[in-house]
Amino acid sequence: MNRQRLLKIWCLKKLGETHRCYSSAGDPTKLINFSEFTPEKIRNFGIVAHVDHGKSTLADRLLELCGAVPPGQQQMLDKLQVERERGITVKAQTAALKYQGYLLNLIDTPGHVDFSAEVSRSLAVCDGILLLVAANQGVQAQTIANFWLAFEKNIQIIPVINKIDLPGADIKSVETQLKNLFEFNSEECLHISAKSGLNVEKVLDAIVERVPAPTANVEAPFRAMIFDSYFDHFRGAIAHIVVKEGSVKKGDKIRSYQNDKSYDVSEVGVMRPEMVKCTEVRAGQVGYLVCNMRTVKEAVVGETLFAAETPKESVQSFAEIKGVKATVYAGLFPVETADYESLKQAVERLCLNDPSVTVTPDASKALGLGWRIGFLGVLHMEVFGARLSQEYDASVILCQPSVEYRAKIKDNENIRKKRYDGMEEVRILDPSKFPEESDVDSFLEPMVKVRMIVPNEMMGTVNGLCSECRGERGEISSIDTSRLMILWRLPLAEVAVDFFERLKKLTSGYASFDYEPDGWQETRLVKLTILINGKEVSEFSQILPAAMARDRAKTLVQRLKREIPRQQFEVTIKACIGSSTKALSQIVIQPMKRDFSQLLKGNFGGGGMERLNKKLSHQKKGKERMKMVGNIQIPKEAFLNVLKN
């Protein structure tokens, strides 16, 4: 099969259908010219799937078959170091492919639920998608979520069953699942092996035949939408665009709709999958544009770019790409306070490439200036931290994540006006701003609707986990003869941190899950405070539902015991609720003792024992005084290790 594929690539190259092109900035005649591809000859499509169903492998085979990369290359569209290390797709990537007289613009998307915003943003560019399902795993939770994302946008969906050459592949079962869940007939499903290349040519043919051409007008003045962007240290913000009308080339003058700024275009091109300069990017095509945008706020996702000579009043801006609301929040601080400014710049630039992140300034007595950052999940948070380290060489502290809560303030004008700026409902993200319980009618916590696909025999185990997480059971439906789809309504606080890890452990990795926001629910919130020798250390305070307080208290106290060095006096660590001094969990770190028997050289005769007891008595009284007035030495590393995720 590999020899046949290589032979086909060689023949296509001979016929001039496909070729790898390189450009020279100094010679315009050597730039790639895509003007031959009218909108009717363009197909913009994406690949969506659950994690580990073969998206990146299929993308590699498509790149090979279209001559964009040499055979044998792997993870060509996973360009970030964190993607290659973890084996997951984090950022959607594009590639322009030539195939039998057509220009196919491929958008590869992530599969993890934490990066659903990337999928949603990519679908704004696509006219069709490949819905990839592994034959040995079947339809999973994220498969269903991705289908409905595309269905709601009225995008053509092509079902593709991958990994058909594996011993555990069950093609008939997967076809039944696709029929029952999405009403796909078996004739619509393509059967492939992305790893070996089996039947991948049929995927390209199906894209040409089934995906509609983009709606575009080449004759109209230039108008395009930014669907992604990133910051280059030398060229500024580089915008990935889909051109809806007209064309753009080097030297053109363009304007942005929201910022109302004018720019001179210095470079245009396409991704193949690396950046390749072109003579122009025309209506219907997907490419990139460089125009000396020097601040990260100028290349926001969803921005409309148009020809500078076109009156702004006559330009129709594109519908805003809806952002996905953050689900978890965590403090982010530089390890060294002197690095604050450089880290601030790195955070701003990375947020340009990841607009789903929300940033607000924060400060800590122990850690200095920093930010409270909102993420779409814990994996999203970990990847953000890894990218700061790998791409910007930044050393950061990411604190324990939490979720947003709300408080309904009592209907009392004095309370609302004096303490809460007249608001009836306040957001709670920071423990230091936790409202007085006497001011609050009720607390609210965010809820999510969780969709899980589990083997039949593990339903009881999974239901037990969800009940333990304060959940409400929903519908149960059959996927096939061996698997069930279970719906539960759970508090986001239970899901956001370690629910998936616990689910995988209980089901030996056979379960998958996806979740979506499902309103708010009344709860009893508490502020967990840490007292060290009776003094509150605000950096360790946390807000959480009362049902989770005892377990979290034990964890924090144990961490602190490991991190705080022994002192000359006894140190008592207590975890309490609010201003109460009653401990949920308590540990005592015993003091260091001075061995007076060594000083007295073991000579206890002639009153030696009395002298020893006298010394020990003096030591005890001295330590009592130190405990009352002394400051406990808590090293900065203790804050880092206790607060970090």
UniProtKB/Swiss-Prot annotation:
Swiss-Prot/TrEMBL keywords: GTP-binding, Hydrolase, Membrane, Mitochondrion, Mitochondrion inner membrane, Nucleotide-binding, Protein biosynthesis
Presence of keyword Nucleotidyltransferase: no
GO cellular component labels: mitochondrial inner membrane; mitochondrial matrix; mitochondrion
Start and end residues of each tr-type G domain: 40-215
Signal peptide, first to last residue: none
Glycoprotein in keyword set: no
InterPro entries named in the record: EF-4, EFG_III/V, EFG_V-like, EFTu-like_2, G_TR_CS, LepA_C_sf, LepA_CTD, LepA_IV
A GO term for molecular function: GTP binding
Gene3D superfamilies tied to this protein: 3.30.70.240, Elongation factor 4, C-terminal domain, Elongation Factor G (Translational Gtpase), domain 3, P-loop containing nucleotide triphosphate hydrolases, Translation factors
Location in the cell: Mitochondrion inner membrane
SMART domains found in the cross-reference section: EFG_C
Annotated catalysed reactions: GTP + H2O = GDP + phosphate + H(+)
Chief site of localization: mitochondrion
Pfam families attached to this UniProt entry: EFG_C, GTP_EFTU, GTP_EFTU_D2, LepA_C
Membrane topology note: Peripheral membrane protein
Any GO BP: positive regulation of translation
Sequence positions that bind GTP: 49-56, 108-112, 162-165
Domain of life where this protein originates: Eukaryota
Annotated function: Promotes mitochondrial protein synthesis. May act as a fidelity factor of the translation reaction, by catalyzing a one-codon backward translocation of tRNAs on improperly translocated ribosomes. Binds to mitochondrial ribosomes in a GTP-dependent manner.
PANTHER family: TRANSLATION FACTOR GUF1, MITOCHONDRIAL, TRANSLATION FACTOR GUF1-RELATED
Annotated family: Belongs to the TRAFAC class translation factor GTPase superfamily. Classic translation factor GTPase family. LepA subfamily.
Protein name (record): Translation factor GUF1 homolog, mitochondrial
Source organism per UniProt: Caenorhabditis briggsae
Taxonomic lineage from the root: Eukaryota, Metazoa, Ecdysozoa, Nematoda, Chromadorea
